[in-house]
UniProtKB/Swiss-Prot annotation:
The keyword Cytoplasm applies. It is an enzyme of class 4 (lyase). One of its GO terms (cellular component) is cytoplasm. This is Ferrochelatase. Its EC number is 4.98.1.1. GO terms for molecular function: ferrochelatase activity; metal ion binding. Keywords: Cytoplasm, Heme biosynthesis, Iron, Lyase, Metal-binding, Porphyrin biosynthesis. The gene is hemH. Fe cation binds at H204, E306. Catalyzes the ferrous insertion into protoporphyrin IX. It comes from Coxiella burnetii (strain CbuG_Q212). It holds the Pfam family Ferrochelatase.
Length: 354
């Protein structure tokens, strides 16, 4: 069925000289690691009501009076530690991914990259696909686990600028076999040179209230424990999706429950965020005598500040202070060949939805 749908789509595209557009969306990055550039980026990012979901006046006060006067200077210094000669790692690797996915999909497709915040914008990416005479649009936010502050916000940005009449969306892929296999292969490649005592899957955190707003009917569960397997009661719960991704990867790696754990990083502000917190989890692991730790960040398909600096530098330093021997950060999928093929397969599979 899938092969027939793909064949029909290809024939239609060639017959009408129209391509199928694929829009890859990532979060975004400052233009440069300077205070003004970081301030512009943070202003746009944090002004999104899906990111800081409080009344507009309260959000304005938080952003303009509590964050922007102080955070840009600190964040700029962090970006400077990871900035590449070619530019922001997130942008460099995302562009590399876009190019290779385009090469893999072939001439019947046109692949564009849009950032929810910063450049290239979603609007710019959509214009490129329109100029390429694409008639159908496949939207793939590069966020494996669905959340309102990432996926829903990105899709809102698309709908605000979209003129395509035929559009399909891949709004999550946390349990997609091609994604899980790509993650497993990446980890296996790094196991050839490092054998850890323990695996830690570290995901981007969210305020707990976001889980309730997502419709999770298990909001009363003790969030310090593992989430239940995905069901109709928690299928939109970001935390549950993270645990499901971890379970699937661990199963592929033949790990027992005692060999891996799940934690959440990058919390901001004083609100209650989903637990356990990555930095505190490291403390608990050190108390258990763990010395060699492998950290995997499945919610970040592309390396960025949160992986390279927060884990690769800060968590590494914390681990050494705690008496750990080695903290090995697994690179993000970036433009790994298997991941490129996985995206191409997901895009082709989505053609059945037109």
């Amino acid at each position: 069925m899938a092969k027939q749908a793909i064949k029909r789509a290809k024939i239609l595209a060639v017959k009408n000289n129209n391509k199928i557009g694929v829009l890859l969306i990532n979060l975004g990055t400052p233009d440069e690691p300077s205070v003004p550039a970081v301030r512009r980026y943070l202003r746009q990012f944090l002004s999104d009501p899906k990111v800081i979901d409080v009344p507009s006046l309260v959000r304005w006060i938080i952003v303009h009076l509590c964050i922007l006067p102080f955070r840009p200077k600190r964040s700029a210094k962090l970006y400077q530690k990871i900035w590449m000669p070619e530019g922001s790692p997130l942008l460099v690797y995302s562009e590399m991914l876009r190019e290779r996915v385009g090469e893999t999909l072939g001439d019947d497709f046109c692949v564009a990259l849009g950032m929810r915040y910063g450049k290239p914008s979603i609007e710019t990416a959509l214009k490129k696909l329109q100029e390429a005479q694409c008639r159908q649009l496949i939207v793939l936010p590069l966020f494996p686990q669905y959340s309102t502050s990432t996926t829903a916000s990105a899709l809102e940005g698309v709908r605000a600028k979209n003129s395509f009449k035929e559009m399909t969306v891949i709004d999550r892929f946390f349990e997609e076999p091609h994604y899980i296999d790509s993650m497993t292969t990446l980890i296996h490649e790094n196991l050839n040179e490092f054998q850890p005592d323990y695996f830690l899957f570290s995901y981007h955190g969210l305020p707990e209230r976001h889980l309730v707003k997502s419709g999770c009917q298990l909001a009363i569960c003790n969030r310090k424990n593992n989430c239940s397997p995905i069901s109709s009661s928690n299928e939109n719960c970001y935390r549950a999706q993270c645990f499901e991704t971890s379970r699937l990867i661990a199963k592929k790696l033949n790990l027992t429950d005692q060999q891996y754990g799940v934690a959440f990083q990058s919390r901001l502000g004083r609100a209650k965020w989903i637990e356990p917190y990555t930095d505190k989890y490291l403390i608990e692991l050190s108390k258990k005598g763990i010395k060699k730790l492998m950290v995997v960040c499945p919610s970040f398909p592309v390396d960025c500040l949160e992986t390279l600096e927060e884990i690769g530098i800060r968590a590494q330093s914390q681990w050494q202070r705690l008496g750990g021997e080695t903290l090995k950060l697994i690179p993000s999928l970036n433009a790994h060949p298997q991941w490129v093929n996985a995206i191409a397969k997901m895009a082709k599979k989505s053609l059945q939805l037109f």
